[in-house]
Design a protein with these regions (language model features):
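C-terminal substrate-recognition/cap domain of FAD-linked oxidoreductases
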Residues: 55-59, 65-242, 249, 253
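Glycine-rich N-terminal segment of FAD-binding domains in flavoprotein oxidoreductases
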Residues: 216, 227, 250, 330-385, ...
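A glycine-rich phosphate-binding loop feature that marks nucleotide/adenosyl-phosphate handling sites
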Residues: 95-107, 153-167, 216-221, 260-270, ...
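A glycine- and small-aliphatic-rich helix-loop capping segment at beta-alpha/alpha-beta transitions
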Residues: 5, 29-30, 53-59, 111-112, ...
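FAD-binding subdomain of flavoenzyme oxidoreductases
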Residues: 1-95, 296, 314-319, 415-416, ...
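Alpha-helix capping/hinge segments and adjacent helical runs
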Residues: 251-263, 288, 292-296
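Intrinsic disorder at enzyme termini
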Residues: 276-337, 348
Length: 444
């Protein structure tokens, strides 16, 4: 419901590698200039040292309803998750725990989770008291329609705290089950959660590891815990292989290798599952612009160029090839623009992106003649995943055409800039970082 860290960071003060102190963003909602704040958040200390942060804050909510939904099949719990989101309901939390985690938590805290359940969901909604009960009842209906065995509401703050104690203490409770555990942190589209959980179980069985699942189901962020003993060198090798295969499986399902734990060194080689060498070249160029001497947290995130990676090329999964094909297809549709840019660069000409021309009056006149680049040929829907509420469209698609496509599925892009009309392109929306009156509903 509230998004991730970058949605709440308004501004930063940071020290660059040469000692210069700079500010990015600030308390104003729409600072001018490039969004360096967005570049810094998530950079893992590789671009600068943050010394001061301005964040967005919210008032405490008026009412909270916390529910515990019980399931006999973990796949049914996963179905409830994406059906709730697909219904247009955004709980502030949707957390899942499977049978192994339930037992571990009950042994440690006695939270009242049913030990015979295959999975439980902790679902919490909050907001004004008026209407909140209706939202909770709709969630309960969806859960029962997806084979929930039982669902109950916490009666008071003490009961709510007890439910949350189990979730907060889950990792500590699991520590009693084995000398060590490997925490995976990969993400899949919500509709792929049942399949992802099946593959996690299959991989764990393949290598002979017990696995427990406790994770942020609402955004598809998996946390399989593989139990092992690091004193056993074979287990240590095998658990790394299993973790790698779980990441591969998530990428195969349209997900990614990390949801919130970052990349650092541990997942550096796995970056090749989701990025091409051209992608890395761009990221290395950004790193070099901030840190040309490579003094800040060197060697993190981006794998080195060449053949220095830990994983052999044969282990890189098929989705990279699929993505390469997708890029090839995109390049084919964008070929005229690519050719125009190459030609302009060779002749040292300036270029100016153009859509339908409806917003050409924004900004100042070019300081020198510029070659227009027409994006209107890029007007198709590239991929539309309605259940996961994601659409990818060409930059030349008009705002009106996009909204019309979405409305056929009872969806919309929640932006209505006052100066926009149906013929304006999505590219212009991005270029101007345009916003509308609904921004306040999304924490804006």
């Amino acid at each position: 419901k509230y998004g991730v860290t970058t949605n709440h960071i308004l501004g930063l003060e940071m020290v660059l590698p040469d000692g210069e102190v700079v500010r990015a963003g600030g308390a104003a909602l729409d600072p001018a200039g490039y969004d360096l704040r967005g570049v810094m958040v998530g950079s893992e200390g590789t671009f600068g040292i943050t010394t001061e942060i301005t964040v967005r804050i919210l008032p405490l909510t008026e009412s909270v309803i916390t529910m515990l939904a019980v399931y006999d099949k973990i796949a049914d719990a996963a179905r409830s998750v994406y059906e709730i989101i697909a219904a247009g309901i955004l709980p502030n939390t949707l957390e899942m725990m499977d049978a192994m985690i339930i037992d571990a938590v009950e042994d440690s805290y006695s939270c009242g989770y049913p030990r015979d359940a295959a999975a439980v969901l902790i679902i919490e909604v909050e907001g004004p008291t008026v209407g909140l009960k209706d939202q909770a009842e709709r969630i309960q209906q969806i859960c029962m329609q997806t084979n929930c065995r039982d669902i109950k509401e916490a009666k008071d703050d003490a009961e709510r705290e007890l439910l949350w104690q189990g979730r907060r203490g889950a990792f500590g409770a699991v520590a009693r089950l084995a000398p060590n555990y490997l925490v995976n942190d990969a993400t899949v589209p919500r509709t792929k959660l049942p399949e992802a959980l099946e593959q996690v179980a299959r991989i764990a069985e393949k290598y002979g590891f017990k696995v427990g699942n406790v994770f942020h189901a609402g955004d598809g962020n998996l946390h399989p815990l593989l139990l092992f003993d690091s004193r056993n060198t074979q287990q240590l090798r095998e658990v790394e292989k299993a973790g790698w295969e779980i990441m591969q499986a998530c990428v195969n399902l349209g997900g990614t290798i990390s949801g919130e734990h970052g990349i650092g060194l541990e997942k550096q080689a796995a970056m090749r599952m989701i990025f091409t060498e051209d992608d890395f070249d761009t990221q290395r160029a950004i790193k070099h612009a901030f840190d040309p001497e490579n003094v800040l947290n060197p060697g993190k995130i981006i794998p080195p160029s060449g053949n220095g990676d830990r994983q052999p090329k044969s282990s890189i999964p098929a989705p990279v090839l699929a993505r390469a094909q997708s890029i090839s297809n995109s390049q084919a549709s964008a070929a005229p623009i690519m050719e125009s840019i190459r030609k302009a660069a060779s002749q040292k000409q300036a270029v100016m992106p153009m859509g339908s021309g409806t917003l050409s009056y924004f900004g100042n006149l070019p300081v020198r003649p510029a070659q227009p680049l027409d994006s209107l040929s890029l007007a198709e829907v590239i991929e539309y995943d309605a259940p996961n509420q994601v659409i990818t469209a060409g930059a030349g698609m008009t705002f009106g055409a996009l909204q019309e496509t979405l409305q056929a599925h009872n969806q919309w892009l929640p932006l209505r800039p006052p100066f926009f009309h149906a013929d304006a392109t999505i590219g212009s929306l991005v270029s101007l970082a345009a916003c509308g009156p609904e921004r306040m509903a999304y924490g804006a």
